[in-house]
Amino acid sequence: MIHYALSWRNTNEHLFDIAIRFIAPEDQPRLILPSWRPGKYQLQNFAANVREWTPNLRKLGPNVWCADATRGEEVEVRYRYWAGVLDAGSSYLDRSEAYFNGSNLFLWIDGLRSDECVLTVDTGWPIETQLPREGNELRARNYDHLIDSPAIAGMFTTQSFEESGASIRLVSVGCDTARFVEPMRGIVREQVAVFGELPVNEYKFLIHGGDRWHGVEHEDSCSMIVKRGAADFDEHFLSLASHEFFHLWNVKRMMPAAFAPYDYTAATPTRLLWAMEGITSYYGDLSLARSGYWSEQRYLRHLAHEIELLESSHARTHLSLAQASFDGWVQDVTRPHDRGNAWYSFYTKGEVVAALLDLTLRARGMSLDEVMRVLWAERILDEDAVRRVVDDPLFFASYVDGVEPLPYETIFALAGVRFETRRKRRALGLKVKDGVIESVASGSSGAAADLLPQDELLGVHGLRVHSTSDVEHALQESNTGDEIEVVFARNGGVMTRRVRLEDDAPTEVRLHIAEEDNALRREWLRRRG
């Protein structure tokens, strides 16, 4: 058994104190901190936050230590961890809460990863976690279970409801969740109807008010950061919560073979991220429609927005969905690069492709619901199984493995939905925020003007600009073929370019109900729970 202890001295320091006690399985046993965490398919640098380790620990590598001990000796090591950044996958400590994720905090002992773990938390604050509790001890089956079980300690509020034989708890810090109980009840009911069962007795949403939207799935819980003061807050909240809850089945229990068991020390590329995250996004938002929270037209408006996002990416013309999934590990969204032209989100295209696949299956008397039930019965999610159950090689060859244009008009027509496009206002193919260029579309006027991501855009056509909408405003009287002047700063210098406007205005997508009484659409969106 491995004994972990967590405490803190002063919340203003944002430092957790961690102690680990174990019997050394060998001489000089190694202790390792994960290089990434499940739910975030990128390598991360958690070890940079580790400091002040005891003298009996010696560092061997970026995230590897060894203990000064001989085989069979009882060892205790201590260290501190800085927890000053709040996101759903981090650990965080301030005067109102202690939020801890084991994948950031807890070293595992090489050779003892399958041993039972006990975590003692030294605090007078109440604690919420999915781990079973005996007194002040939290118990985990093994290290994987320990780090897949985040916890909140502090001044939280709780809303609870019963649904489908399980207790669902909304545990929140800095966010009022009372109004979400009934919508969440409907969402839970609809997702249970897809799979036919709810495989837990209790599920917890650990929710933090913050400055962004972010969620991470766990075995019997999820963590969410919700953006306080955001427009359409309730819709975003429910969409995120619905997405994370669907992971209870898809990914947490239907796990690709590549992740069984997890290798926390290295990247684990897979071509299935589109199914793991894209199908989850599809059902997350579909559940809002099926539960009645969204109207049919509101759901179609959401799908149209996702299609717009996808179609705005040049990468869709040369990068398959399977390859975008595989390449997710090398896409660092925090660093400036040409990501918009080289890659797109497997969440976005995965959701769009899942919707088109579902409608295609329904036209032949099947559905994606049935596919998910078969995969759930087999407790499997791998490429061969998905393709075998769907049994449509041409669809996969064209839209998952290939880069064929997606047949929106034809497939949405099956559901009595009309697909329409029109040109938006031109913006040189740029996305601009706070005066800084975030992306430049390949083949656009902005690319012809030699603009790069992270350039400071100073002026367009004689006007000062700070945002994409400012660029649109500056060009509202201009036409294709007109020559305009662009002023920007790069590498400490100011540059001016003259460029001829291309026909590169982005596309606006609209989905309209064309047939009021369409049997396929009615069955697709009807309430099931």
Model-predicted regions and their roles:
Residues 4, 16-20, 75-77, 117-119, ...:
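Hydrophobic residues positioned within well-ordered beta-strands of beta-sheet architectures
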Residues 183-194, 240, 244-248, 252, ...:
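Generic, well-ordered alpha-helical scaffold segments in large soluble proteins
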Residues 161-273:
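Juxtacatalytic substrate-recognition/specificity segment
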Residues 9, 38, 43-52, 56-200, ...:
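Non-catalytic architectural context of zinc metalloproteases
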Residues 284, 294, 298-529:
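C-terminal recognition in membrane/secretory proteostasis and scaffolding
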Residues 222, 228-229, 253-254, 265-316:
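Post-HExxH zinc-binding segment in Zn-dependent metallohydrolases
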Residues 23, 122, 487-489:
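A generic structural motif
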Residues 1-36:
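Early extracytoplasmic/domain-onset interaction patches
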